[in-house]
Amino acid sequence: MHGERPTLGDIVLNLHPEPVCLNCNEQLDSSDSEDDHEQDQLDSLHSREREQPTQQDLQVNLQSFKVVTRCVFCQCLVRLAVHCSITDITQFQQLLMGTLHIVCPNCAATE
């Protein structure tokens, strides 16, 4: 730079594109034992997911929920209080969105 302030002419860029090799020369040693080990880990994970929780696990994860829905016949509001796990309340929600309908006490007495 010559002078007090740089000018565009003072800045000289010598940039040229350089080819870069993007190939990876790394080789992975894939053996059957590693594949079997990974499969065993996946199987173990899936089997743990399928295991039923113990009674103590169920008691720890229980929560109270308020459910408000409408009677299938008269459309009046029906309020329920349930005590269950988050998994169970999610399943209950799916049932209510499907073919399971709640009936109010008045309609239940007349049906």
Swiss-Prot record:
The keyword DNA-binding is assigned to this record: yes
E7 terminal domain: annotated segments: 1-44
GO cellular component annotations of the record: host cell cytoplasm; host cell nucleus
Bias type Basic and acidic residues, positions: 39-52
Primary residence: host cell
Protein's job: Plays a role in viral genome replication by driving entry of quiescent cells into the cell cycle. Stimulation of progression from G1 to S phase allows the virus to efficiently use the cellular DNA replicating machinery to achieve viral genome replication. E7 protein has both transforming and trans-activating activities. Induces the disassembly of the E2F1 transcription factor from RB1, with subsequent transcriptional activation of E2F1-regulated S-phase genes. Interferes with host histone deacetylation mediated by HDAC1 and HDAC2, leading to transcription activation.
Protein name, UniProt field: Protein E7
Gene that produces this protein: E7
